[in-house]
């Protein structure tokens, strides 16, 4: 007699405390992605200490970000905020000459009601450099939402940024489009523009674009682009598609304010997710996919050595970076058992396609659909972990050491944020991260770890 497996997703919401990095940490990868930018954080010394300790960049390295520390005079309104920011931005222009300055507002600027949005337009007209204001403060649910805030603010500039650059440089076309290389000519279908949004390393973005190019789908641009002057043109009739699950605010901005058309698709994490991502995009342009099934099979074949290590193992997601649904779906497809998916925040509309793929994957693998807990209570989670005893807990850094001290295998979820995990070619990196603590403990057991400890 076979047990019936539920085919419905179960959502729960707790009101417990959750621990994550501050969203201003998004500067650590965005300043490297947007090469002609400069990030100016407006906050207290605490924000400065956090950035210095988190990024670990020395002063003499001259990174393209800085901290505007608020003093008592700023908080008590004894100083002129506009003049202080103007002085800093003029110095930034003189030293670095960026094409855009991005102000990152923090919790303190919210509390003292600093009008950054009101000062930015006046100041940018004075110094001749675009200034974008993003409120990436600690009031968000997860640190990855800092990128979401920055991209949503940057989306408003996509239509006007080329005109601004022409006026500033006095030239019609400062950056001409790259020429097609010989032997790489591809006949694209006559379809509307497609822009992808989400920050990825340049080499990963250059892997995803060719995957669509093989299907005769042309990517007109990325948000963010490698240079601010290369932002895509957005507007009515332009299709957009996200590559990360924590960009719901950007998606809403593109649809509501820029009148773009959002393609709801799973996210390109793992071979199954990448194939589903492409299969959602192509029909929108009346293009039939070719060779995707063979491409996915080829990748799964190359992952057999890792899959043999994780098959039958159990994993518990405590929730930290909003990548949990996509990672859980991929690991279930690899044969793992997911007890629980904790997630700091869930936008069911934006992640609808990913949730549907999670359900279909569980049905295909004949495993129960894990329950999804939004804003999990960490104390309740620890109790459930003690009861379930999973082989691996993917958790934030705050809980990793306490769990390790109790004999639990852990993996920092922040590592998945910075690792290259998107696309067919990088599926191996996900399993490398997941299996590392498992392989490490197996090697210690072979050395007689118990005897050594005693």
Curated annotation (Swiss-Prot):
EC annotation?
1.3.7.7
**InterPro entries listed in its UniProt record:** LIPOR_BchN/ChlN, Nase/OxRdtase_comp1, Protochl_reductN
One molecular function GO term is: metal ion binding
Similarity section:
Belongs to the BchN/ChlN family.
Subunit info here reads: Protochlorophyllide reductase is composed of three subunits; ChlL, ChlN and ChlB. Forms a heterotetramer of two ChlB and two ChlN subunits.
What job does the chain carry out?
Component of the dark-operative protochlorophyllide reductase (DPOR) that uses Mg-ATP and reduced ferredoxin to reduce ring D of protochlorophyllide (Pchlide) to form chlorophyllide a (Chlide). This reaction is light-independent. The NB-protein (ChlN-ChlB) is the catalytic component of the complex.
User: Can you say what this protein is called?
Assistant: Light-independent protochlorophyllide reductase subunit N
Biological source species:
Cycas taitungensis (Prince sago)
